[in-house]
Design a protein with these regions (language model features):
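Short arginine-rich
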Residues: 98-115
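N-terminal secretory signal peptides that target proteins for export/translocation
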Residues: 1-2
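Short S/T/G/P-rich N-terminal loop/turn motif that feeds into the first structured element of a domain
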Residues: 5-7, 12-96, 117-123
Length: 123
């Protein structure tokens, strides 16, 4: 009986671990933008919301003047964007709608985009 209980506990732990491993973690874009043509950049800004909303992302922070504690951080704007998963983040970034906006943004600014995996949130 004791062996059966131990075996059951081990199997349950393995299943729970597998389920947690399979769950996708949130993903975050950290974006640093230097705008060189405000008027042209306006077209990117105007189209961003409607394309972005289709993919369930959330803009967590936007700052024109972040507090630099170490190093150098030259940018007109710094943005942090959250998606529920890396796959959703990449689906948005690689979408036809957003890639059309990327071409506009690239003519009006220079930008650095990085994608970070978030930590798995406890259940």
């Amino acid at each position: 009986m004791r062996r059966l209980s131990l075996l059951t506990a081990v199997v349950v732990a393995m299943v729970v671990g597998a389920v947690l491993w399979a769950q996708e973690r949130p993903a975050y874009f950290l974006v640093k933008v230097t705008i060189t043509d405000q008027d042209a950049y306006g077209a990117y800004r105007d189209g961003f919301g409607s394309v972005f909303q289709q993919y369930g992302g959330e803009v967590l922070a936007v700052s024109a003047e972040p507090t630099v504690l170490e190093g150098e951080w030259e940018a007109t704007a710094t943005v942090i964007i959250r998606f529920d998963s890396r796959s959703e983040a990449l689906e948005w970034y690689n979408s036809d709608g957003y890639q059309e906006l990327v071409r506009i943004r690239q003519l009006a600014s220079s930008a650095d985009f990085i994608l970070l995996d978030g930590r798995q949130q406890p259940g």
